[in-house]
Amino acid sequence: MNPTRLANAKRLVVKVGSALVTNNGTGLDLSAINDWARQIAVLRQQDKEVVLVSSGAIACGMQRLGWAKRPKSVHELQAAAAVGQMGLVQVYEGAFAKHGLHTAQILLTHDDLADRKRYLNARSTLNTLLELGVVPIINENDTVVTDEIKFGDNDTLGALVANLIEADALIILTDQQGLYTADPRKDPSATLINEATAGDETLEGMAGGAGTRIGTGGMITKVIAAKRAARSGAHTAIASGRETDPIIRLANGEPVGTLLVSQTQPLAARKQWLADHLQLAGRLILDAGAVNALHAGKSLLPIGVIAAEGEFERGAAVACISPDGREIARGLSNYGSGEARLIARKTTQEIENTLGYVDEPEIIHRDNLILS
């Protein structure tokens, strides 16, 4: 395991599974939760930013309601999630408060990250919380979703959050030592894989598909999550949450568990996402000065926009059109079409006078823009 890969990570997402959070379904494991908070506090002292993705609401609710068997009814699962989330948040808040850290609860659905406007709002909120030194604690909003309450949700959610905040690393803590060449519970010759490339097709065959009766995912979902996180440049570590100080040791670059390495630089991965996965909702007509600015790698400011065509909301993908009608770039607009028309040809300082507020100083930030 290359020690520099995670040691250089400044922004990390840590995902802990239900089996760890609830001590295999016997109630919240207070000792483990307090220990994770202690480890994350150490990382905060090292000026590392950490987002915690925690499973456990449904499992905690099952324990509180006295249910030994995971129900199959969606509404019963949602009821358990509602009951359990209360206990989960209270415990995390108390654990981090011992180290002088504030926490924030964020409940997401996959739809929140698929919708561009909500995606930008979630990203802005998370970035603000991290700037404030707060530890965001994220869980799937199981009480309102339907299809998302299924196999592997929070492994996927951890990867999506890593993409969302452009994290350097995703740490997935589980009840296994890492990824093996075969299921070690069935094959005594199975060996631990120390390092591999995220997205290697052979890994999914090694991972199998078994989960626990408390959680919903198995190792296969973690391998798929690592592949997804790698698209935005994040390396993924899969390790046992029952090791001594796994979060600290991984963040320091120690060889714990399995490291699945992203072969893509973060910015390149983000640009690829912008190029391949966005449907254009409108067009911004630019002046020559704005065209030159974009070619120089700068953001698109309102003063360089002549007109906005089409009807689109904040976060929508738009094409940037040169004065001679050529598409020169595309990106995510920080303003809806109505707002864009109002602030076109205005300086950044004039945005607030025009709209009464400022979402962002740019119409399209350079990180959300790719040249055509």
From Swiss-Prot:
GO cellular component terms, alphabetically, are: cytosol
GO terms assigned for molecular function: ATP binding; glutamate 5-kinase activity; RNA binding
Q: In which pathway does it act?
A: Amino-acid biosynthesis; L-proline biosynthesis; L-glutamate 5-semialdehyde from L-glutamate: step 1/2
**Residue numbers binding substrate:** 55, 142, 154
Residue ranges constituting the PUA domain according to the UniProt record? 281-358
Reaction(s) catalysed by this chain's protein: L-glutamate + ATP = L-glutamyl 5-phosphate + ADP
Q: Where in the cell is it found?
A: Cytoplasm
Q: Matching SUPFAM superfamilies, A to Z?
A: Carbamate kinase-like, PUA domain-like
Known EC number(s)? 2.7.2.11
Question: What InterPro entries does the annotation carry?
Answer: AceGlu_kinase-like_sf, Asp/Glu/Uridylate_kinase, G5K_ProB, Glu/AcGlu_kinase, Glu_5kinase, Glu_5kinase/COase_Synthase, Glutamate_5-kinase_CS, PUA
Which protein family is named in the record? Belongs to the glutamate 5-kinase family.
Biological function: Catalyzes the transfer of a phosphate group to glutamate to form L-glutamate 5-phosphate.
Q: What is this protein called?
A: Glutamate 5-kinase
Provide the species name.
Dechloromonas aromatica (strain RCB)
